[in-house]
Every structure is written in C-alpha cells, then in structure tokens.
Amino acid sequence: MEGEQQQLRNLRDFLLVYNKMTELCFSRCAKNLNYRSVTMEEEQCLDSCASKFIRANHRLMSAYVSLMPSVVQRRMAEYEGAAANVPPIETEPSADHMPPVISSHSGNSPTNKQLDSVSDLPVGK
C-alpha cells in the first residue's frame, strides 16, 4: 500500500515537472501559430529549452540527494533532543494527585474498620 502511494507521488511530481517544462518552453518558443508543423527555429528553441530544463532538474536532484542524509540526521537529532526534554509519564498516580474519597456509609458499603480487618487476614499462596 505504501509503495503504491509512493509511486503515485512520484508520478504526480513527474507530471508537474513535465507540464511546467512544456508550458514554459511553449511560451518561449512558439511565436507563430500559422503553420501546422513546427518551424526549424521553433524546433531548435524547444530542444534548447527542454535540454536546459532537464539539466537543471538533474543538478537540483543530485544536490537534493547529496544533502538529504545530513538533513535527516539533523532532524533525528532534533527529535531525540526534544524527546529527552519531555518529562516521563507517571504510570501510577501519586498521593498528591489522587482525588478525595467520598464515602457514604449506607447499609451495603463497608466501613474503614471493616476494611482494616480484611487487610489483616493472611493471604493464601
């Protein structure tokens, strides 16, 4: 599932770059729309424009790939530093944070004296 999503993101990114390059090169090179075929001048312009765009994209990607490990390493160090500053979560509440016990001594609830006598009983193994 994750692999398919990554492929879709890659395809989307490729299509965005392709569409941007096509739009940019067309606006720069297509001067005369009176003919069905591309003129020699337009063809050379399109070839030059596309080549420049592709070379620039390759240079940017190589710079990105070379910088990415250091960026990931720096982010991991930041996350670990932030995690070290977070106070640990208490698993059992302390006596200071315990809510007060409200008891009503009705006929069915045990009293403190009855509870104390139960805690004195021997525990079986």
From Swiss-Prot:
Could you describe the subunit structure of this protein? Answer: Component of the TIM22 complex.
Its predominant location is: mitochondrion
Instruction: Please provide one cellular component term from the Gene Ontology annotations of this protein.
Output: mitochondrial intermembrane space protein transporter complex
Region Disordered, residue ranges: 87-125
- Give the function comment from the record: Component of the TIM22 complex, a complex that mediates the import and insertion of multi-pass transmembrane proteins into the mitochondrial inner membrane. The TIM22 complex forms a twin-pore translocase that uses the membrane potential as the external driving force.
**Which residue ranges does the UniProt annotation give for the motif Twin CX3C motif?**
25-49
Q: Which UniProt keywords apply?
A: Disulfide bond, Membrane, Metal-binding, Mitochondrion, Mitochondrion inner membrane, Protein transport, Translocation, Transport, Zinc
- The name this protein goes by in its record: Mitochondrial import inner membrane translocase subunit Tim10 B
Q: Please note every region of biased composition (Polar residues).
A: 103-117
What Gene Ontology terms describe what this protein does at the molecular function level?
Answer: metal ion binding
Q: Which GO terms describe its biological process?
A: protein transport
Membrane topology of the entry: Peripheral membrane protein
**What's in the domain note?**
The twin CX3C motif contains 4 conserved Cys residues that form 2 disulfide bonds in the mitochondrial intermembrane space. However, during the transit of timm10b from cytoplasm into mitochondrion, the Cys residues probably coordinate zinc, thereby preventing folding and allowing its transfer across mitochondrial outer membrane.
The record's subcellular location field reads: Mitochondrion inner membrane
S-S bonds: C25-C49, C29-C45
Q: Which family does it belong to?
A: Belongs to the small Tim family.
- List, alphabetically, the InterPro entries matched: Mito_inner_translocase_sub (IPR050673), Tim10-like (IPR004217), Tim10-like_dom_sf (IPR035427)
User: Is Ligase given among the entry's keywords?
Assistant: no
